[in-house]
Every structure is written in C-alpha cells, then in structure tokens.
Amino acid sequence: MRFLILFLALSLGGIDAAPPVQSRIIGGFKCKKNSQPWHVAVLRSNKYICGGVLLDPNWVLTAAHCYGNDTSQHNVWLGKNKLFQREPSAQHRWVSKSFPHPDYNMSLLNDHIPHPEDKSNDLMLLRLSKPADITDAVKPIDLPTEEPKLGSTCLASGWGSITPTKYQIPNDLQCVFIKLLPNENCAKAYVHKVTDVMLCVGETGGGKGTCKGDSGGPLICDGVLHGITSWGSIPCAKPNAPGVFTKLIKFTSWIKDTMAKNP
C-alpha cells in the first residue's frame, strides 16, 4: 500500500495539495535554492498538509495541529525547493511514529471549541522510519539556547497560500522577512489566548506573514531556529494582526527528552 501511495505521488510529479489546514506565506519571495535545507514538507498519504523542520537525521519537528488520526500515512519530503516537481536533491521518508506535545489540546482539531481558545504547546515530533541523508540540500538545524530578541528580523518559510483569502499554494518554497514583536501586540489582536510559550511575529502594517499551509514550518531569527508556525489572522497578514508561533526555547527539554527516549 505504501509503495502504491508513493508511486502515485511520484507519478503526479510530486505532491497533491490538501484542503487548507491552518497557516501560509503572504508578501514573500522565492527562497534561494537550498537556502533552507532543514525545511520539510509533511504529507498525509500524498497530500501536502504542513511544513516541518529537520532537527536530526531521524527527527522532524512540526505543529501538533498537523496531527491526523491515521498516522501510518504520515510521510515527509526533504531537500525540496519545488513542491510539485521531481528533484534530484529530494528524499522521501515515512514517519514511524508521531509525538504530539502531551499538553496540546487535541480537541482543538475538531474545530468546535468555544472562544477563547488556548492553542499553546502546538508542536509535534515525527520519528522517521529511516535517517535522512545529509547533503547540501538536506541539513538539520539546532534548537535555540537562549531567548530571541524583540525587534529581531526573522525569516519564515513555507509552501502555504500566497493569497490572503483564496487558498493558492506555490510550487516554489517561499520566504518572508518579518519582525519579532511583543506578545501584547498579538494579545490585542485576537480573542484566542496568547501565552508565554508563543511568539508574536509579523508587520504592524500587514501585507507580510505566514498563512494556510505554512503551519509547522520554521521561524529563523538572527540565524537561529526560534519558532514553529502555529496560527494567525483570517484573512492572513492583516494590519495589526501578526502571526503566532510556538516558542521553541520553552520546549527544548521536552524535545530532547522525547528524542533520547525513542532512539
């Protein structure tokens, strides 16, 4: 069955688009080839659902809301610059096990929760069935060792929608530069809870940010991985409505412990 699914994905030239999930890139630009070698495409069967980050040859980090009931169909593509085209640099791996953060509220996945929602702890580790081969196009990135600095210019990347209201995903991996803002900016913008395990990132004037399909992808601030795309405004990149990211410095112990206990 897995061979059949992989064959179908390859015969289609890569990957199908899935219905919108939660987050995407607006106002960005095509990333330079292989400039984000840790960026991963996370799939369910042959449907693209989220981004992810390679932390180790055996481990990918993504968002917990990318979780699906049938985890046996989770798989990833690494080393891709073009989502829907075959590339010599690309590597395919199945996911052997998923580890959503134990404190993430999984009932949020039903999308029938009264406001305000608390989307804290939105991260998930994926154990690969076979280690990734490290190449120029596939490289892990380290976890942060200190707090990010307010005002930093950060880089988000993803294959999420490039239009704010209509779900239109690009072939080329997109990058966007956005600012790390005080969490108060996001707390004022949303009815959902903004907690100390989240980062508020975007442009106060709007027009740039993440959107549907970018969920689980990396946020790099001053060259360091500091966040995972989590949630934001609808339509995306509205003025005074920055994006919200999982703050990884708060979760390094859980990430390292989970990886160590599941070699």
UniProtKB/Swiss-Prot annotation:
Q: Name one GO molecular function term.
A: peptidase activity
State the function annotated in the UniProt record. Serine protease with chymotrypsin-like cleavage specificity. Shows activity towards casein, gelatin, IGFBP3 and fibronectin but not towards laminin or collagens I and IV. Does not hydrolyze kininogin to release Lys-bradykinin.
GO BP annotations listed: proteolysis
PANTHER family in the cross-refs: KALLIKREIN-1 (PTHR24271:SF47), KALLIKREIN-RELATED (PTHR24271)
- The residues forming the signal peptide are 1-17
Question: What switches its activity on or off, per the activity regulation note?
Answer: Strongly inhibited by protease inhibitors diisopropyl fluorophosphate, phenylmethanesulfonyl fluoride and SBTI.
Report what the protein is called: Kallikrein 1-related peptidase b27
Q: In which tissues is it expressed?
A: Expressed in testis and submaxillary gland. Not expressed in heart, brain, spleen, lung, liver, muscle, kidney and ovary. In the testis, expression localized specifically to Leydig cells in the interstitial tissues.
Which terms are listed as keywords in the entry? Disulfide bond, Glycoprotein, Hydrolase, Protease, Serine protease, Signal, Zymogen
Question: Which PROSITE patterns does the record match to this protein?
Answer: TRYPSIN_DOM, TRYPSIN_HIS, TRYPSIN_SER
- Which residues belong to any copy of the Peptidase S1 domain? 25-260
The answer to keyword Cell membrane applying to this record is: no
What residue ranges constitute the propeptide?
Answer: 18-24
Native source organism of the sequence: Mus musculus (Mouse)
Disulfide-bonded cysteine pairs: these are 31-175, 50-66, 154-221, 186-200, 211-236
What residues make up the catalytic site?
A: 65, 122, 215
Which InterPro entries does the record match to this protein? Peptidase_S1_PA (IPR009003), Peptidase_S1_PA_chymotrypsin (IPR043504), Peptidase_S1A (IPR001314), Trypsin_dom (IPR001254), TRYPSIN_HIS (IPR018114), TRYPSIN_SER (IPR033116)
UniProt entry tagged with the keyword S-adenosyl-L-methionine: no
- Gene3D superfamilies the record matches: Trypsin-like serine proteases
Question: EC number(s) of the enzyme?
Answer: 3.4.21.-
**Glycosylation (residues):** 69, 105
- Family per similarity comment: Belongs to the peptidase S1 family. Kallikrein subfamily.
